[in-house]
Amino acid sequence: MTRPSGEIFATTRWTIVLAAGGRGTPQADVALEELCRTYWYPLYVYVRRHGHSREDAEDLTQAFFARLLEKNFLEGVSNDGGKFRAFLLVAVKRFLANEWDRANRQKRGGGVAPLSLDWQDADTRYQINPADNISPDKLYDRAWAMTVLERVITRLRDENSADGKVAVYAQCERFLMMGKDAISYGQAAAALQMSDGALRVAVHRLRRRYRELLREEISQTLSDPALADEEMQALFSALR
């Protein structure tokens, strides 16, 4: 069932983390780890674009998360911390500037790996990034935006699969994807043996649910869900 929009994101993962501050609570620890598991790839991309090898980027990313997940890391971070995306970027910049030597002195594989991450997939995805002069910051934002959209599409697929609407979703999804050559409504409706009008209604509902999930995903990374529209604009700009 679709939850109503409106007052549903007064509490987000990021507000839970910020409210705990440096004290750490089980709920905040879980919320922060979920955020890190979701958005680790943009950090890896940022470190790679800074010129680090795959192996060093893996080590640095894990070392950063080991530091981030320490109980006292968030001491002093105000409860109006804004956007997790911006916080994480500033934090990794400081980490690379101040702690690279210490991290580099650790024996490879000897440190703590706080998160189990798919490095092979990360490297494969990184290799398809354009080999241009795009800055690490811009590539980070682009990877973040793609991560958000991928999560939304995955959730849409899962919801429709659970509702037994796999075939309908497979056709409707074509009308969601940006830059993808979509078949006509008539062709898609014929493939599903439904009317053109019925398909248009299904696509309209899917787009509406897509927007709801997109806002929900974005809001989970904000201290104030009222920032969702601003963050949405920033992420779409990063994809241009």
Task: Give residue ranges: language-model regions.
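Intrinsic, short, N-terminal disordered tails of RNA polymerase sigma-factor systems
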Residues: 1-240
